[in-house]
Swiss-Prot record:
Keyword Ribosomal protein listed: yes
Superkingdom in the source lineage: Bacteria
Assembly: Part of the 50S ribosomal subunit.
Species per Swiss-Prot/TrEMBL record: Morganella morganii (Proteus morganii)
Its job: One of the primary rRNA binding proteins, this protein initially binds near the 5'-end of the 23S rRNA. It is important during the early stages of 50S assembly. It makes multiple contacts with different domains of the 23S rRNA in the assembled 50S subunit and ribosome.
Cellular component GO terms, alphabetical: ribonucleoprotein complex; ribosome
Disulphide bridges: none
Presence of the UniProt keyword Ribonucleoprotein in the record: yes
Ranges in a coiled coil: none
Region described as Disordered: 44-70
Name assigned to this protein: Large ribosomal subunit protein uL4
UniProt KW keywords: Repressor, Ribonucleoprotein, Ribosomal protein, RNA-binding, rRNA-binding, Transcription, Transcription regulation, Transcription termination, Translation regulation
Length: 200
């Protein structure tokens, strides 16, 4: 299939990577798994067995007029243990390579259909200056954008790192969540070839 580039040239790309049907269920599963994998899972609370304190009965069972009590570590008491205490856990979900690649292909194909994927011959700035990149993006009418190159140019990376809703990555760093999150994705022709090789 042919994709029209920004400068009116066309680029021949694989239909299996950029022209497949959108598999919403697969994309949802991969995105949820990706987000789950980012969770720290380090929260921890103490049960009544783990709270520091004496095991002594606070007062005798009968005769005081107070409610009976057997431990200062009871969950009913202030500073007592937690009834169903949270423990550290691994939230990661398994996603095999075939599913992950399939989700990326689905997302890239949907970006093409929605005219959110812009292909350029090359994308660079002459110096590591934010204003140069801002002007370049303004000329292209782009704001919320992820720029994908076959290798990250240092000038481009430094110019973009202080910009809101602008991200620069190489092909190996793209992921399903980021591709969906940005309004537009600018990709160099070299990066497109690299993506095809990576997802082949």
């Amino acid at each position: 299939m042919e994709l029209v580039m920004k400068d009116a040239q066309s680029l021949t790309v694989s239909e299996t990577t950029f022209g497949r049907d959108f598999n919403e269920a697969l994309v949802h599963q991969v995105v949820v798994a990706y987000a789950a994998g980012a969770r720290q899972g380090t929260r921890a609370q103490k049960t009544r067995a783990e709270v520091t304190g004496s095991g002594k009965k606070p007062w005798r069972q009968k005769g005081t007029g107070r409610a009976r009590s057997g431990s200062i570590k009871s969950p009913i008491w202030r500073s007592g243990g937690i009834t169903f205490a949270a423990k550290p856990q691994d939230h990661s979900q398994k996603v095999n390579k075939k599913m992950y690649r399939g989700a990326l292909k689905s997302i890239l194909s949907e970006l093409v259909r929605q005219d959110r994927l812009i292909i350029v011959e090359k994308f660079a700035v002459e110096a590591p200056k934010t204003k140069l990149l801002v002007q370049k993006l303004k000329d292209m009418a782009l704001e919320d954008v992820m720029i994908v190159t076959h290798e990250v140019d240092e000038n481009l990376f430094l110019a973009a790192r202080n910009l809101y809703k602008v991200d620069v990555r190489d092909v190996t760093a793209i992921d399903p969540v980021s591709l969906i999150a940005f309004g537009k994705v600018v990709m160099t022709a070299e990066a497109v070839k690299q993506v095809e090789e990576m997802l082949a």
